[in-house]
Amino acid sequence: FEYLCYRPLLKRYYEEDSNMRHESAPKPRLTDADYRKDYLSDKIGIQKRLQWTEEKFFVTTEEEPLFDAADVLRFGKDLIVQHGFTTNLKGIDWLKRHYKDHRVHAVNFPGDPYPIHIDATFTPIKEGLIINNPQRRLPKEQRKLFEKNGWEIIDAAQPAHNEPPPLCYSSVWLSMNVLVLDPKTVCVEKSEKYQAEQLDKLGMEVIPIDLRDAYAFGGGLHCSTADVFREGDLKDYFPKQ
């Protein structure tokens, strides 16, 4: 039901702008063929899961295109897409075919045994700066795009909590699930003091938001929002490909 919140906005944009296109991705069938049987069995240990992640062997198969928007980061003309549990290679290929004017880059994070959504792992803060989960670092080979375009990738601060709140299925790394409002302003969960301190030292104005009790509904500040409209011009942040 998330789409119901911003559907009135889309309706307004459609009516105001003759160039606005309202499109939807193909809805997957989600049959048993989309998943590897017993992949999530409790009998499988963490080391095996980390090995599978490094080998890009995930619970989802390549039966049909699958992707979640929360696995995608948009940097102007470039889409950075996490290949993992909720986005497969066919899903990434669908994005490439559909958005021909954009460059689509697949990334993965070997340190995450359950790679679901990118925004508690890899978070752009402002032009030229990204914080990366220190337990799920972007592989060296995949850093080249960022490095040759002058982007710095630094470790995110440690979470303030040792475990998530009751009924929350996300990790403690929702600490870095922040909401950037503009190049100087960022919203951080009120109790995440270490992440707030790091961003303050990086020159950001930090706005504390009390949201931890809502984590059980599916995530943090970034998870709770959808940027349906962005102000400004379309910029090429990675001219050196």
Where is each model-derived feature located?
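The feature marks the mature, well-folded catalytic cores of soluble enzymes
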Residues: 1-241
